Amino acid sequence: MKQLIILLVVFLNCSYLSAQWKPAGERIKTEWATKIDVENVLPEYPRPIMERPDWMNLNGLWNYAIAPVGQAAPQKYDGQILVPFAIESSLSGVGKRLGKDNDLWYQRKFSVPSKWKGERVLLHFGAVDWKADIWVNQIKIGQHTGGFTPFSFDITPALKNGENELVVKVWDPTDNGTQPRGKQVNKPSGIWYTR
């Protein structure tokens, strides 16, 4: 059976919401950054050698909330974040640091095209730094640990007709944890960092 992919490279296609989004600050503003279209962020298929004819890009505006580690999913979200950009980045529209004591919650709604009926639907993440828990329609789909590796889940059993809800909880201790990292540190310094 042909598999379909929903990509999380990760949220809404609403003109009202896109009018509300703006970069968080003016740090490292490039020509490319000024041309971001929140309704069509990074529209290209991310894995050309594995391209499928039917797929959905979930990049865009998502709801987000920052909560202490271990709390249940929020009932109310703090605002909008532009996925796939990290919360610390200007292009996320948030520009905040989290730290090891907080979880970052993402939420969005999506509808599966009717022509996908009877097909398997995969939810694919290019990477989530560092630990991610995923729910579709309040059904836990799975968990992944590792900030540099892509992963997928078959979400077919959790889908319903019409609107579906996707929730992702992320925890990243940055340099307070034991996971491998590049330049990610809580107190950046030296010649490799901009301020």
PLM region descriptions:
Residues P53-N57, N102-W105:
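Short coil-to-beta-strand transition motifs
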Residues Q20-W55:
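N-terminal pre-domain segments of enzymes
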